[in-house]
Regions:
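Conserved loop->alpha-helix
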Residues: 1-114
Length: 114
């Protein structure tokens, strides 16, 4: 049997990100992907994100971009190796992350007003 890795994805695209930079090292690649500020609360280091339909783990995050680290296996079984700097990619935020973040925000706002 084949193991299915990654997180559950729905195919709902939240935004289109742009590849700001690609760092190549040996047989791996780091993609640095820009994102709109309104999604900053949902893009967390070691969290999950969908990039062009592929479930990936988020690396470092800064105010305007996040990193994903692509290992040889990922590069060989996806089309992510064909991406270039400046390429647009479809981004799906992990639904569990969105739900947890929104729940915490709602609880905190209720506590502040109550």
């Amino acid at each position: 049997s084949t193991e299915i890795g990654g997180h559950l994805m729905s195919g709902h695209i939240h935004f289109t990100g742009k590849i700001k930079k690609i760092n190549k090292k040996d047989n791996t690649k780091d993609l640095i992907i820009g994102f709109p500020k309104k999604y900053k609360d949902y893009i967390l280091e070691k969290g999950y994100i969908g990039v062009n339909g592929c479930s990936l783990t988020i690396g470092k995050v800064n105010k305007e971009a996040f990193y994903v680290h692509l290992i040889p296996e990922t590069l060989s079984v996806t089309n992510l190796d064909m991406l270039k700097e400046g390429s647009n990619v479809n981004i799906e935020i992990d639904q569990n992350t969105m739900t947890i973040v929104e729940t915490v925000k709602n609880i905190l706002s209720t506590q502040k007003s109550g």
